[in-house]
Amino acid sequence: MEEFQRYIELDRSWQYNFFYPLIFQEYIYGFAYDHGLNKSILLENAGDKKYSLLIVKRLITRMYQQNHLSLSANHSNQNDFFGHKHKKNLYYQIISEGFAVIVEIPFSLLLISYLEAKEKKIVKSHNLQSIHSIFPFFEDKFLHLNFLLEILIPYPIHLEILVQTLRYWVKDASSLHLLRFFLYEYRNWNSLITPQKSISFFSKRNQRLFLFLYNFYVCEYESIFLFLCNQSSHLRSTSFGALLERIYFYGKLEYLVKVKTFTNTQDFRVILWLFKDPFLHYVRYRGKSILASKGTSLLMHKWKYYLINFWQCHFSLWSQPRRIYINRLSKHSLDFMGFFSSVRLNSSVVRSQMVENSFLIDNPIKKFDTIVRIIPLVGSLAKAKFCTVLGHPISKSVWTDLLDSDIIDRFGRICRNLSHYYSGSSRKKSLYRIKYILRLSCARTLARKHKSTVRAFLKRLGSEFLEEFFTEEEKVLSLILPRDSSISRGLYRGPFWYLDIICIHDLANYE
C-alpha cells in the first residue's frame, strides 16, 4: 500500500493551483474558438453570434448565488436574465469551451515534456499511434493465449465523480467549484448521459469539455489498474486456499525467483506472490477494453470480480457483472473495432514414410483470422442513403447538383477510405460487396443527374470510371507483380495493416 501511495504522489507531482483567473481572460475564449488574438470575439452589443466577456463574468457570478440555483430548478422566467433562453445556453457553451482549454493546460505541458524526453531516445514508436497497430499485436500475442475479458468500461453515473477525479490533479478549489456549479446549472446536463451507450453519451453541444472529463476518468482508471497489473498478475485470495490452481502453478515454476519446499499453507501463499504472468495483455479503444491471459478460467473470474470491486471502491460505481464477459479464444470471436477476430485451427497434414510403413500426421496450426462485420456496415451505408437496408444500391439524390467529377471523387474517396481501413480483413469478399454498392450507387447518381440509364452511362464512361474505386494497395501491387502470379494472388487475398490510421471512418463507426 505504501508503494502504491508513492506511485500516486509521483505521477501527480504536477499540480496546478491558479486556473481560476484565466476564466476571466478574453484570449482563452479566442483559443477555444480558434479566432485570432488581434480580433476581439467578445464584444458588447453585437449580434446573437457575438459574445460579451462582461456577460460571461456576470453569468459566472450568478451561478454562485444560491437563490439563482434554486430558481433554475423550477425553470422560472425570472431565471432568464439574458432575455432569451437560447442565449443563456449559448453562454453556457462558451464557458464550457473556455474551461476545457484551461483544464487541458497541465496535461498539454505533460505531453510536451513526454515528447521532449522521447526525442532523446533512439527508439521511436510513431507507428504505434495507428489504431491498426492493435491487430498485428493481436496476431503476435493471441495465438498463445487462452482466455480474454471483454470489458465495457462503466460510465460515471454522476458528473460529480468526474469533478472528484479531477481534483487530484487540479488543486485550484475555485476552478473546481465553478465546474461543479456549471454542471449543475446547465439545465440539460442530465440528458447528457444515455445509459444505452458507452462513450457517445456526451452532448455534442459541450463535446470538448465533457469528452475531456471522460477521457481523464478513463486515464485515471487505467493508470491505477495497469500499475496493479504490473505489480502482480495473481490476485491473492486468502479465503479460497483449497482452490489453488495447481496446473497453472506447475506451469509457472520457471518464473519463480527461488523455489523452496512448501511446508505449510502460509509459505505457499508467500511464494505465490513471486509469480508473474508474462502473458497478460491489455488493449482499449474508446469505451471497450480487452484483458487477455494464458491463465485458467478461475484466474479470469478473479480479475472480473476484482474489477467490479475496484470501480465500486475507487470511483463509487456499481458495474454490473454482465458488462464483463469471459470468453475462451478458441471458441469465441472477438468483436472489436469493426472486425470479428478469432483464433482458428488450420489442419496441416504431413505424410511420413518409415521403411515400409507410412503415416499421416495432422498438425493443427493456429491462425489469427479477421473478417469484416458486413451487416452493420451495410446498415451504415443504408443510413447514409447509399443503398437499401437489404444492400441494394440507390442513387444519392442530394449529390445530383454537384459536378460529375465531384460526385465520382466523393464516392471514390469513401470507397478508398473504407477499403483502406478494412484492408486487414482475411476475407476480401465482403469488401468487394461494399465496393459494388458504392460503385453502382455512384453510377445511379450520375444517371439520375443526366436523366439516363445506368447501363448507358457505364458504357459511355468505360474503364476510367472503375479506376476511381481502386484502392491504394491494389494499384501498388498491380505495378509490382502481375495479377496472374501466385505471389500476387496471395498478397491480394492477405491482410494489410496500415500505420497511418488514427480513427475509424464515419461509415465504419457504427458502434
UniProtKB/Swiss-Prot annotation:
Compartment(s) of residence: Plastid, Chloroplast
Function field: Usually encoded in the trnK tRNA gene intron. Probably assists in splicing its own and other chloroplast group II introns.
InterPro entries: Domain_X, Maturase_MatK, Maturase_MatK_N
UniProt keyword terms in alphabetical order: Chloroplast, mRNA processing, Plastid, RNA-binding, tRNA processing
GO cellular component, one term: chloroplast
Single GO MF descriptor: RNA binding
Homology family: Belongs to the intron maturase 2 family. MatK subfamily.
Keyword Lipoprotein recorded: no
Protein name as catalogued: Maturase K
Taxonomic source organism: Maihuenia poeppigii (Hardy cactus)
Any Gene Ontology biological process: mRNA processing
Main location: plastid
Entries under Pfam families matching the protein: Intron_maturas2, MatK_N
